[in-house]
Regions:
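Small-molecule-sensing regulatory modules
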Residues: 2-59, 78-107, 116-363
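Active-site charged/polar residues at nucleotide-handling catalytic sites that mediate phosphoryl
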Residues: 72
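Periplasmic solute-binding protein
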Residues: 110
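Conserved, well-structured functional cores that handle cations and Mg-NTP chemistry
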Residues: 65, 75-79
């Protein structure tokens, strides 16, 4: 696959899926991170993200997002891990920036007819006497590369793989294939077509991921900075997902005594790193304020444990309890950013030099 030279264009480009649930989920996630995609004309395939000036957004089929990353036509992409593995085929230039964007969750697996009572595992399928060199197992899939590698790794030689783009579940009933290898989410479609998964037949787990070209990250000005900002926003939003801030007024003699009381209530009341305790200034009759009677305690807790937290705070004398969702939780530095720099052979000071248009520090 011929690769476009870096100097062939100046604009930074990101490719995202153009159709289907993956496209909707991608844009919803970006919008949640204040990275809304704006398309001036609904018929156009090019768009922009106003909060990221200088970057073009291109709507492409999922397969083409990966291909255009490989050819250098886009620098950044959002795509399912399944498609990255199938089309990217472990291309060393493709770097996974974020491997768990929280949507598109599914897995790629082998499914056989439910009528095959004696085939409930891959080992049983492998030893099935019905299939031989003269009469190989016929597998239909849209993931030819992954299927070929999977069956080879399992030592299954008597397999013929055919390709199809849709309605794979109908192939065994039609007699066009013996089994399928396809994406599974809930498994409902398999059951409705009288198919079943087998033990050991799971090829990989998949969900949406953020991918970038290694060459673009290192050589195209601005790409690494944009990826850093996107990663910060994504990590902060995803970390806050399902986390609520609970605030209560607690009586105490000092902030330290209140903090000790809260922490003694167990791990639930310790929040993300520990409770935040702040003095409340109570208005007095003479117009002044008095500190030290009540303290505001704020704790980040999972949504599923909100009421349990409220009850615990009440037992400690808490009142005026407020609960509100968190939108972002920014870390000191996202762990995935540190990991990305390591994959690129860079350190934090190298990023600072690159962001100023300078060469990385020689080592």
């Amino acid at each position: 696959m011929k690769k476009q030279p870096i100097e062939a264009r100046e604009a930074i480009r990101m490719g995202i899926p153009s159709k289907g649930r993956m496209a909707e989920d991608t844009q919803d996630l970006l919008k949640s991170c204040q990275l809304s995609v704006r398309k001036l004309n609904p018929r156009q395939y090019a768009a922009e993200i106003p909060n990221v000036p200088g970057m073009e957004v291109w709507f492409q089929r999922a397969t083409d997002v990966v291909r255009k990353l490989m050819t250098g036509d886009v620098d950044i992409g959002i795509v399912g891990y399944d498609m990255l593995r199938e089309i990217g085929n472990e291309d060393e230039d493709l770097v996974i920036v974020h491997d768990a964007l929280g949507f598109g969750g599914c897995h790629l697996a082998v499914a056989v007819p439910q009528a095959w009572d004696n085939v409930n595992s891959l080992s049983q399928l492998k030893s099935d006497p019905r299939f031989s060199k003269e009469r190989p197992l016929r597998v239909v899939t849209a993931y030819v590369n992954l299927a070929t590698k999977f069956f080879k790794d399992q030592g299954m030689e008597n397999v013929v793989i055919t390709t199809a783009d849709g309605a794979l579940e109908a192939a065994p009933a039609m007699g066009a294939a013996d089994c399928i290898l396809d994406l599974v989410s809930s498994g409902t479609t398999l059951r409705e077509n009288n198919l079943k998964e087998i033990e050991g037949g799971r090829v990989l787990d998949s969900q949406g991921c953020l991918v970038a070209s290694r060459e673009a990250l290192l050589k195209r000005p601005g790409v690494l900075e944009i990826v850093h900002e996107m990663l910060e926003r994504l990590e902060a939003h995803l970390r806050a997902n399902g986390v609520f801030m609970v605030t209560a007024n607690v009586r105490g003699s000092s902030a330290e005594s209140v903090a000790e009381k809260i922490c003694s209530g167990g791990s639930l009341l310790r929040g993300l790193q520990g409770p935040t305790v702040s003095p409340i200034y109570t208005p007095q009759n003479d117009g002044t304020t008095k500190e030290g009677q009540f303290y505001a305690v704020s704790i980040g807790v999972p949504k599923t444990r909100i009421y349990e937290t409220v009850k615990s705070l009440r037992r400690m004398g808490g009142s005026g309890v407020l609960v509100f969702p968190m939108t972002y939780v920014f870390d000191e530095e996202p762990p995935r950013w540190t990991s990305l720099l390591a994959q690129l052979g860079l350190k934090a000071e190298d990023f600072n030099h690159l962001s100023r248009g300078e060469a990385p520090v020689a080592r």
